[in-house]
Amino acid sequence: MKSHYNIWIAESYSCQNDIIQLLKNSNLSPYLTIFCSHSKQRPELKLLADYFFQQPVIKDSPDWLLEQCKKHSIQLLFCGKHSQFIEQFREEFSRHDIQLVTGARGISQHKNVNNKFLFGQICEGLNLPSISAAKVAHVNELKQAIDEYQQRYSVICAKPVYGVYGAGFVQLSDDVSYFMKFQSNTLCNTQQFIEAYAQLE
């Protein structure tokens, strides 16, 4: 076992900051040198990581990341945002003894992870904790799912199947006014949500 590790936390969602903080505050901290990169200026990351680099946009960054990892003797590369672009180069990173962490293994698994409903079913099939969900494609299916879930749970939420995990997430409630949607982007009157969804058809 090595006595020291160089790890690289590449562009991620808001978790990038959290991951670096957790590593810095962990028992592993004395044994780690943390490199990180982002395609935008992120001063808070510069303050946290041992080294910060401006990286190309994710879809253009696999070659750049590989070169940087080789140059700085990186043992582990974590990619948390649009990591399917990096996943395609897993074997190349492995050839240079760089462990690649992208949240999934293989392009097909990345597609599964991006589909939140399918990902929930996969977790359930593996007996991993997951939140019960229904996938709907029409307003009548939405109404039926809402009725069913309101009978089973005191609080229900809705979110798009694809996209950033927190984006579009909304808690539905019969007891809030339509105006609440202008005050909170995460709380919506149930009927208002149904009416808005119906306009998509």
Predicted feature locations:
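Active-site nucleotide/adenylate-binding loops and adjacent lid/helix of ATP-dependent enzymes
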Residues: H110-E201
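Conserved short-loop catalytic and cofactor-binding motifs
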Residues: I7, E11, I107-S108, S130-A133
